[in-house]
Amino acid sequence: MDLVTRRIRGALGIAGPLLFLEGVPRARLGEVVRIRGEPEASGRAAEERSGQVIALSRDRIAVQVLEETRGLAPARSEVTLTGQVARLGVARGMLGRVLDGLGRPADGLPPPVPEARPAIHGAALNVTRREKPSDFIETGVSAIDGMNTLVRGQKLPVFSCAGLPASRLAAQIVCQARVRGGEPFAVVFAAMGSPFREYHAFLEAFRAAGVLDRTVVFLNRAEDPPIERLMTPRCALTCAEHLAFTHGLHVLVVLTDVTSYCEALREVALAREEVPGRRGYPGYMYTDLATIFERAGRVRGRPGSLTQLPVLTMPDDDLTHPIPDLTGYITEGQIVLSRDLDRRGVYPPIDVLPSLSRLMGLGAGPGKTRDDHRPVADQLYAFYARGRDVRRMAAIVGAANLGEEEKRLLAFADAFEDGLVGQGGTFRTIEDTLEAGWRLLSGFPPAALTRIPERLLRARPAQPAAAATSGGAIA
């Protein structure tokens, strides 16, 4: 046994993705392990796998194997502890590449020549070095850009129900997202637990839109081991940090689906026989998610930014489920998809009332988008909330029994959903979104627009009221 690597012949046993060893001196948590095993079937060549030390006790250790353990014979395995932590070779040349969940080429091309090999378990940004998030990222989606603006350095999750087009929305944002002013921009996309149909659709969408050259894609498939799923977002963020803070790019990281990640975390925790917490998830899931989300931000004195848009599916459509509940505590808002809007054929089915971007004020307004951005958004919110209340009342008393003001609000709510929110797969600039909002508001007298300063109302040309109350789509 040398000073750099330690080799052990034979293991105690295997339980799922875990390999147990005893008599291993100086093992460290997170240490990379190489496993050379002989399958049970005779006559086959030995296979080599990799793993990571995840638990230590006085006389034994547990290793998470990154590949399939089926057919691995513990007694005939040779385990090498390398003394190294998991690292990823990163480079600007990763742009345009499709990688697996561990950062290995999945597009048939050779690995990129690394410029550095940082550890994938990076720390959150130092709070004393953080720069306040500012300036917005244009996604081309009106319900986000206009009503819940995404700011550079922010972490803004998308909460979806099972069966809603969250993956389609994620792909659309990857294809459409940009920053204003010609600054360098890139997207890092990480899919976790994706079935073949889904990840194939992602790649086809990126290629068709011509955005693959400024995108790095990490694909963890549904059939891949759960431990790989736990490393995929960390590999993606390690790559994004290099692009953002070494090369000065503004990087948007899209992670989907965080629920698959949490399910893998629970599966591995149960295999380690840990005491489960709420609904079987480990008690440290909050801390684990924080190690992912808190890597977003900006660094004082350095160009570039790292923005996160994680997508998660709420089990049983439950906002209080541990996954969305804990995610909401860590992140800075949420974009909520609605099953009711989806049933009505509205795409993207974003419900703007429970949605929120807590940092919108840092990326919207004078010098960032337009002077009228916040006032128009606030007025649209106010009328839409009242229109939703009227809709519930109309379901009881009937629309024919509503007053003129209530009918106007009801028509506004329909037009808002069908036109402003339900834009389909088209791209809208922030100017297009705000002009669409003004057309909706033109159906109300100026005295009713209490959220908009008078100077902005005087600066607007007169518009026909029919566009706001017709209930149809907005051009």
Swiss-Prot record:
GO terms for molecular function: ATP binding; proton-transporting ATP synthase activity, rotational mechanism. It comes from the Bacteria. It holds the Pfam family ATP-synt_VA_C. The keyword Transport applies. One of its GO terms (biological process) is proton motive force-driven plasma membrane ATP synthesis. The keyword 4Fe-4S does not apply. Keywords: ATP synthesis, Hydrogen ion transport, Ion transport, Transport. Produces ATP from ADP in the presence of a proton gradient across the membrane. The V-type beta chain is a regulatory subunit. Belongs to the ATPase alpha/beta chains family. HAMAP family: ATP_synth_B_arch. This is V-type ATP synthase beta chain. It comes from Anaeromyxobacter dehalogenans (strain 2CP-C).
